[in-house]
Amino acid sequence: MKPIRIGIGGPVGSGKTHLVEQLTRAMHESYELAVITNDIYTKEDAQFLVKHGILPEDRIIGVETGGCPHTAIREDASMNFEAIHELKQRFTNLDIIFVESGGDNLSATFSPELVDGFIYVIDVAEGQDIPRKGGPGVTRSDLLVINKIDLAPYVEVDLDIMEEDAKQARGERPFVFTDQKRGKGIETIIDWIKRELLLEDMVKEPSV
């Protein structure tokens, strides 16, 4: 089954690329990793990871979708499948491929044929009511990440209300609050990846 493919989606500016950078930085010594990024007309996210990340350039492929970013990860994911095939040809021992979607709205989801697990990233600056508004990314993702909690006091967001709304929207599905600038919540996400996707014997549960 290797490598495990993990989709990371969310609106523009929510912190998807930064999350990929932090996950690869924290996990690269223990796992063989690669990344695919999706942008409409550029390879800017891939270039950011090459410049600021820990992985060599040949482990990062930037896909230019040329259209709706949602289509490239669901209805017509052929370019992403080609990138996955290329990475598997380059590196036969990969453990994880992160597939980052282009910035999209709350309706974005990954094809289950493309990824084994789906992490959806929102941020508190988008508004306190985002979890309540729902959408497939919020309600159906395997893990919901609520990022930029450090901004909550400045944008008048009540994290307790966001927590309750996330619980209502997601039922038993887990979610985690993060402050990626300070690394808060990253280890919880890694523990979830190890336990739920890599099927390692972990004991920690995602907490809010």
Curated annotation (Swiss-Prot):
Gene Ontology molecular function: GTP binding; GTPase activity; nickel cation binding
Major location (coarse): cytoplasm
Stretches of the chain forming a coiled coil according to its record: none
Record bears the keyword Nucleotide-binding: yes
Keywords: Chaperone, Cytoplasm, GTP-binding, Nickel insertion, Nucleotide-binding
GO biological process: urea catabolic process
Subunit structure: Homodimer. UreD, UreF and UreG form a complex that acts as a GTP-hydrolysis-dependent molecular chaperone, activating the urease apoprotein by helping to assemble the nickel containing metallocenter of UreC. The UreE protein probably delivers the nickel.
Protein name stated in the entry: Urease accessory protein UreG
